[in-house]
Structures are given as structure tokens and as C-alpha cells.
């Protein structure tokens, strides 16, 4: 079966939340803030692959999601970045936004990669908000939300014989 058009929903990952945490060690009852930053959300990446000839593999995969970033931790531990979701497409694939009809990209070569959607940035931990006047901040920044969009993939074909 030859499929030259597919419409799918893609979601980038949400950024992890920053942590509110305070240093606690023996003989040091009032340690300062040490909350870590949240990890970035995963990206959605299109990659040209000469081993694919049609968009059949996308026809039955209607929703593609990247991983969310993990929240930060105590002792200034950063959250892990969400894993990127790589979508293999045949060379000669054009991507459009389904709602606006806006052209997004054109994959022409094998191995060519285009970031379709960026994941959300991770939030900052309370260590980042420490100042000379506020030495123990009790707040951290939440991670940025994810993006969602419907994308149409079209495979352009060049006929050798008419």
C-alpha cells in the first residue's frame, strides 16, 4: 500500500519543575537553599531516511509525544532532560501545520534533521533566586508547558515516466 499523506498530532515534552529544598547537614541546622533546576522537555525531530518509501508507518501512529523533563532535586541536582522523539520520514517529505496551512519544513536528504517542536525549558530551583536580601527563598519556577500541534506530512513524487 502506498501512502503519500499523513496527518498526526505531535506534542513536545513539558519542562520539569525547579525544586524548593534547603541544605541539611549535621552540625549545620540552617543551611541555605540548594534546590536544583528542572530538566528540559524532549524535542520532536524529523529525520530523513532513505529506507522509508511511504508514510505508511505514520498512518497508524496518530499521536507522537516526547518525554517530559524530570523535576529538580535537593543538593542542587538537576532534573533529567526528556528523551527526544525522532520521526523517520522518507526523503522528499514536506511538513505543514494542519490548522493554518503554514509550511514548516522540507526533508530532502538522508540523515537531514529538523527540529519540528522544541520541548519546554525546565524551571529554576530556589538556589537561583538567592539574593543578599532574600537568602532563603521558598519558591521555585515551574517548568514551561509543552507545545501541541497537528502536522500534515506530504510525500512529493517525481515521475520518471509520464
Residues covered by each model-derived region:
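Conserved P-loop NTPase architecture
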Residues: 1-161
Amino acid at each position: 500500500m502506498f501512502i503519500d499523506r499523513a496527518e498526526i498530532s505531535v506534542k513536545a515534552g513539558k519542562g520539569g519543575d525547579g525544586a524548593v529544598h534547603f541544605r541539611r547537614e549535621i552540625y549545620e541546622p540552617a543551611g541555605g537553599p540548594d534546590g536544583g533546576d528542572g530538566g528540559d522537555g524532549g524535542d520532536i525531530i524529523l529525520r530523513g531516511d532513505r529506507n522509508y518509501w511511504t508514510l505508511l508507518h505514520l498512518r497508524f501512529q496518530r499521536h507522537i509525544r516526547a518525554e517530559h523533563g524530570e523535576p529538580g532535586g535537593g543538593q542542587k541536582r538537576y532534573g533529567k532532560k526528556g528523551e527526544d522523539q525522532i520521526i523517520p520520514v522518507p526523503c522528499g517529505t514536506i511538513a505543514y501545520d494542519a490548522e493554518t496551512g503554514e509550511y514548516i519544513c522540507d526533508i530532502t536528504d538522508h540523515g537531514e534533521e529538523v527540529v519540528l517542536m522544541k520541548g519546554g525549558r525546565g524551571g529554576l530551583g530556589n538556589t537561583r533566586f538567592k539574593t543578599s536580601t532574600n537568602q532563603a527563598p521558598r519558591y521555585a519556577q515551574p517548568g514551561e508547558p509543552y507545545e501541541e500541534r497537528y502536522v500534515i506530512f506530504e510525500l512529493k513524487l517525481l515521475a520518471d515516466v509520464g
